[in-house]
């Protein structure tokens, strides 16, 4: 069965790019969110297998959304996908339960690899 994925990024271009990579590789994108608040709401409704999460977004940033999702579902598989690759931010994301961290710009293979790691 194809992995069900939620994409969260405030940039439409990035959501479209991720969706194209994922669907071309046989994964199902079940939802898209443009901020962390939407991501938390859609996660509860859609129960995706994997969430791609940007960090810098309006209303609720990706780290706050990661914490909110993981507080409701400790097994949530969240992959941070952001241009912010500073060590402290990576560490904070991992400490709060992110399963992977991808720095933009990325190679499409890296996105596929992150989904394939999800059990």
PLM region spans:
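Active-site beta3 strand of CheY-like receiver
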Residues: 46-52
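Short, conserved "switch-loop" micro-motifs in signal-transduction and mechanochemical regulators
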Residues: 84-85
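Acidic catalytic/metal-coordinating carboxylates
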Residues: 35-38, 61-64
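Receiver (REC) domain active-site loop signature in two-component systems and cognate sites
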Residues: 57
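Two-component/phosphorelay signaling modules centered on CheY-like receiver
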Residues: 12-31
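C-terminal output helix
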Residues: 88, 106-115
């Amino acid at each position: 069965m194809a992995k069900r994925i939620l994409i969260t990024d405030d940039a439409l271009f990035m959501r479209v790019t991720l969706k194209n990579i994922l669907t071309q590789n046989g994964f199902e994108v079940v939802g898209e969110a443009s901020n962390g608040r939407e991501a938390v709401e859609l996660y509860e409704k859609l129960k995706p297998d994997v969430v791609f999460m940007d960090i810098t977004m309006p209303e609720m940033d990706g780290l706050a959304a990661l914490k909110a999702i993981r507080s409701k579902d400790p097994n949530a598989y969240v992959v941070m996908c952001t241009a912010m690759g500073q060590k402290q931010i990576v560490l904070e994301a991992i400490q709060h339960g992110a399963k992977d961290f991808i720095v933009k710009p990325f190679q499409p293979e890296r996105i596929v690899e992150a989904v394939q790691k999800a059990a």
